[in-house]
Swiss-Prot record:
It is found in: Cytoplasm. It comes from Helicobacter hepaticus (strain ATCC 51449 / 3B1). This is Tryptophan--tRNA ligase. Keywords: Aminoacyl-tRNA synthetase, ATP-binding, Cytoplasm, Ligase, Nucleotide-binding, Protein biosynthesis. Signal peptide: none annotated. ATP binds at residues 15-17, 23-24, 151-153, 190, 199-203. InterPro entries: aa-tRNA-synth_I_CS, aa-tRNA-synth_Ic, Rossmann-like_a/b/a_fold, Trp-tRNA-ligase, Trp-tRNA-ligase_bac-type, Trp-tRNA_synthetase. Catalyzes the attachment of tryptophan to tRNA(Trp). Homodimer. A motif ('KMSKS' region) lies at residues 199-203. It catalyses: tRNA(Trp) + L-tryptophan + ATP = L-tryptophyl-tRNA(Trp) + AMP + diphosphate + H(+). Belongs to the class-I aminoacyl-tRNA synthetase family.
Amino acid sequence: MSHTSSKKRIFSGIQPTGNIHLGNYLGAVRHWVDSQEQYENIFCVVNSHAITIRQDPQELQNKTYELAGILLACGIDTKKSHLFIQSQIDEHAALAWILDCNIPMGDMSRMTQFKDKSNKNPKNINVGLFNYPALMAADILLYQADFVPVGEDQKQHLELTRDVAMRFNRDYGECFNIPEPMIPQVGARVMGLDNPQSKMSKSAQGENHAIFLLDSPDVITRKCKKAVTDSQSNIVFDESRAGLYNLLCIYEIFTQKSRKSIEAEFEGKGYGHLKMALAEVIIESLRPIQQSYAKISQDKTYIQSVLTKSADSIRPIAKNTYENAKRLVGLV
């Protein structure tokens, strides 16, 4: 089932837990902003997913509005795109139940993220965490998305989404568009500064692990200085030297310079020089975002009104999809 817009539709979701960091920005948000002319974008703050792990209620509310404000500051333009909060639209949870009843236990049991997250939080293994992929599928399918930007860690969930959509269409009748993955090549995997073997994460514990979009210049400089490298001295793009490679890739993305010119720039120079140059580039690149957020965050009612208006404009699509699915399975 397709939609009537001439532009292809993209659904993107981001959780309001933790703080948004450089990996989120370079791997996802920056591409979202750049794609607004080419695609019809639906950006969703997926706060219902966040409560699969126990949250402080007030903190969750605050982080939800903070994330929305940061996305606006990064350049999400609600005249061109939709930006709303998942829990504003009841059809997400309602469709997830219908999908739950049409996903075999075996398929859900194979989801590696459930195993990873339950191992990290053994005292908080709940049904919501297990059913997380069904809600994610509902998020996507509600809006008849053509594409979903996904990292490597979410590809399995999108495959499940595609499988359940195709199975539903076959068993009940045409209802869902089958979404395709959109995997950005550049900046898709920004690694942790303190552990370049693992992806930069909002939930990592180390204070020097990630650079957050609202970090001050002093904090950014400190984190860059403490970034893990190696004992060699030449500065070249070499994937086997994970720490150095990560820093160079971040520098490459922000400066838009070629790898050859970057290697020439740092020829004969030490890691300290690279780290300071990287810190300066990050600080200057984040400055307009931080300045914009400082203005936006002063007016919470503005953020709320933007989110409400966007939710109201997108709700008919969700309602139409849900009502169709509901009718097809025989619910009244």
